[in-house]
Amino acid sequence: MEKITSFLQKWLWLIALILFALLAVFAISMATPTAVCASYGGPEPGVTTFYQAYQSANDALLILGACSIVITFLFKRLRSSIRPIYYIGNFVSCAAVGIMGIASGVTTLVATSRYQAGYATLPIDAMNQYWLDHGSNVTIEKSPAIFPLGYILSVCLVLAGVAAFVLFALKLIARIRYEKSRKGEAE
């Protein structure tokens, strides 16, 4: 059990930091394939509003990513990655990383699936033809790589959150054992 705790303490903050940074980058790049929808002048209704409709999801993911990065730095700053005896700050920061990991993963999954469903309704062939007719070399892919990346990232975020809760439980068990051993020595 100590080896698992030691491993998670040592690497969880770095893995979480990388995943939360990737979430922020993902949020920034999520709508990139359809940014050109804002300038589309074709006859299909709803295309120009498609891009704006998903900006709130991008904003939410970006805010989650930024807040999660701050919480992960707090985890590291409270020395949750090296303390052998656990104090309340260790438990709070560990639980916060777990909550943010799971919340970010679920939010990313929902946002990606909704965005993909909306993307599937776009008249991509007509849009590509419109830009070709107007002398632009802009094209929209029928299935951009952003969707599988979103699903993979969401699973990784949830797994990081679960790992943080496992670490929380291991720290709690270690703290209980520590308190019992102190009581045994006092008697």
Locate the predicted segments by residue.
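Transmembrane alpha-helical insertion/packing segments
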Residues: 1-62
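Structural motif marking the loop-to-transmembrane transition
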Residues: 1-11, 58-59, 81, 85-88, ...
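Cytosolic juxtamembrane helix at the C-terminal end of the final transmembrane segment
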Residues: 2-5, 12, 74-82, 108-119, ...
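Helical transmembrane-bundle signal
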Residues: 16-27, 65-72, 97-104, 108, ...
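Interfacial non-cytosolic loop connecting adjacent transmembrane helices
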Residues: 34-55, 106-150
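Charged, low-complexity cytosol-facing tails and large interhelical loops of integral membrane proteins
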Residues: 139, 146-147, 154, 181, ...
